[in-house]
């Protein structure tokens, strides 16, 4: 006779809703997923009762029929449910989970200059950044958006100059024409924004000076090498 307790199954589900919406069941994301394990259908045998349930994921253990675990490693991970009855007999079930390696978007460098040796309305940006792929069944599902926005200095009104969507390149190293929106006599803030499907956005802000000239005069201002930004000042 079978006098050991029985356990129907162990299940794993994603508790982070943003990830659950895009990642197929049974897959999780390192450092982003919260994995819920649950032991289902635990029963004693011949009058015994279940006195403990232990859930484990790697070296992490929760002593309960249900528990949440961080996804702190990548690769194939074993999840196990173990039950013990009132006679001290045990039963267990295990499943394999796939935890995908991931890192948040990283902006390594963002440089922008006016074209024509600093004398043009057109701005050319150089972007160096990394965006982690999420490879499932051979396909990268972590598409991201890359924006370059500009704002006249002191206004904090951001306008899109570049808007690239559904990008998948992991290592970004490119020059991007950021438009001819930049009046010669005004400085601008330029903002790079990268948003993937998992993390909060990454951004970087830099200053684009007014156009480079030998000397500029007017309205109580004098500028050498660029248009002056402050009244009653001499700027270099």
Predicted regions and their residues:
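Short, solvent-exposed loop/linker segments at the N-terminal edge
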Residues: 11-34, 113-124
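Short, solvent-exposed loop/turn segments at the edges of extracellular beta-sandwich modules
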Residues: 83-89, 195-201
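Surface-exposed, short loops/turns at beta-strand junctions within beta-sandwich domains
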Residues: 67-77, 173-187
